[in-house]
Regions:
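Short beta-strand/turn micro-motifs composed of small residues
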Residues: 34, 115, 140
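Short hydrophobic/aromatic-enriched beta-strand-loop microsegments
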Residues: 1-3, 31, 133-139
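Aromatic-lined carbohydrate-recognition surfaces of secreted/lumenal glycan-active proteins
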Residues: 106-122, 135, 159
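Conserved beta-strand positions
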Residues: 3, 73-75, 113, 138, ...
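Substrate-binding cleft of extracellular glycoside hydrolase catalytic domains
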Residues: 2-103, 108
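A short secondary-structure junction signal
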Residues: 83-86, 122-127, 171
Length: 183
């Protein structure tokens, strides 16, 4: 189970700790995700903005139950936010943020990148190499696995989110995902 811990800077998810404890109490593995807001709003530079978001995530993680799964960086647009950064700037932001969590010695703990193929291909330069260091969590709502094509820069998805209409012991919808058993 992945639990949202924050979005941008200054917006921690107040339910993250309770959600994590409840999931652990029910025997579930947990991981956390940060909804990235790649822009220049913090100190007016890409690097300082990404650093501010990463630093806040690191602080938030110290007060939460230990994760069983790697951190995930959620990259998507919403009705209220879509990054205006050019592709090279967007890549710089993503690489700066992820550098705070990258472990070359233990790559299985490196963060995942979550996003839709179309969004990632629009925001990132086509020649980026993020897929060599970070696994892709692909959001593609279809029940046809052949249509779950990874974004440029990745040769396969690690996790595929195929629906947002799952309901299992909750009051609302849950996202449904498949994880590759082997990479």
């Amino acid at each position: 189970v992945y639990i949202k811990i924050s979005e941008g800077v200054g917006t921690p998810d107040e339910k993250a700790k309770a959600n994590a404890l409840a999931a652990k109490e029910n025997g579930l593995q947990i991981g956390y995700y940060h909804f990235g807001r790649p822009d220049k709003k913090n100190d007016n530079t890409i690097e300082l903005d990404a650093t501010a978001e990463a630093a806040e995530v690191k602080i938030l993680l110290t007060d939460l139950p230990v994760a069983d799964l790697p951190l995930m960086l959620d990259l998507e647009d919403t009705a209220s936010f879509d990054s205006s950064l050019a592709p090279k700037e967007y890549l710089t932001w993503v690489e700066t943020f992820l550098s705070f969590f990258f472990d070359p010695v233990n790559p299985s703990t490196n963060p995942l990148i979550y996003g839709r193929k179309e969004y990632l291909e629009r925001k990132l330069p086509p020649t980026h190499t993020l897929g060599t260091r970070y696994k892709l969590w692909l959001s593609r709502y279809t029940d046809d696995q052949n249509k779950a094509v990874p974004a440029k820069g990745w040769n396969k998805w690690h996790i595929w989110q195929f629906s947002e209409k799952g309901v299992l012991g909750t009051n609302g919808n849950l996202d449904l995902n498949l994880k590759r058993v082997t990479d």
